[in-house]
Amino acid sequence: RDVAKYVMMPGNAIKRHVVVEARMKQLAEDADGLPINRVEYNDLSVGFITSGIAYNYVKEAMPEASVLKLGLLNPLPRKLIEEFAAKVDKLYIFEELEPVVEEQVKAWGIQKAVGKEIFTVQGEYSANLIRERVLGQTLEVDPAAQVPARPPILCPGCPHRSVYTVLNKLKIHAAGDIGCYTLGAVAPLSVIDTTICMGASISTLHGMEKAKGKDYIHNWVAVIGDSTFMHTGINSLMNICLLYTS
């Protein structure tokens, strides 16, 4: 038991912050020698800095390229990255979604690095993305075999079906939440008209009432599952109870 180390009340947290910063500094110094950060030198005309599944896409699309595969992303191995960047003619940073590695590398002054200028910040990457954006190849993809559409549906016997069927017959709108019951938004049930995030169904309905009045929501209900209700939905319900009983 070590309260000073494990209980982060303000006085302890200030002292532990010093320890955290010292640990991060040591990690940064050790990062260059960690075996999980691996350099594969091949053709030095092009190099990729990448990690995770994106590494597999690089190897599939351009197996002849040099690659720095990062296993530790925070902190980044600065010396290793600078040495790798200096040895390759063209440098690409291939990371999905936000340019976390790219921004840090460019902040170090490695301006030859190319990342989100040609790679998307949305969706999943693929080997074909590299072939298209780096190699300039026009992809000829065979059309997928025509198969019957099979949209997701609620499981047979699921009680959500019965609830949504009744709401549909009564022409009731529903503010939905996160869960399999979000499928109430699509045919043939077509009841849910809005879904934002976990726990938002109740608060959305409350917000509608505040903005538009009670008459606007007379034919609306909030639909929420048990786990989502315990996540943040209960807070919205408590807020309604407080406001309407005070």
How does the language model describe each region?
Residues Y244-T245:
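Conserved small/polar residues in nucleotide/adenosyl-binding loops
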Residues S51-V58, M198-G213, L237-I240:
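Structured alpha-helical segments in the cores of large, soluble enzyme domains
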Residues D142-I202, A211-K214:
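Active-site diphosphate/adenylate-binding microenvironment
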Residues N56-K59, V101-E103, V163-V166, L183-V186, ...:
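Short helix/loop capping segments that flank catalytic or ligand/cofactor-binding pockets
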Residues Y216-H231:
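A short, small-residue-rich loop immediately preceding and capping a beta-strand
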Residues I81, I234-L237:
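Generic hydrophobic/aromatic pocket-lining and core-packing "Φ" positions
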Residues R1-L154, P159, K171-I172:
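Flexible, low-complexity linker and terminal segments
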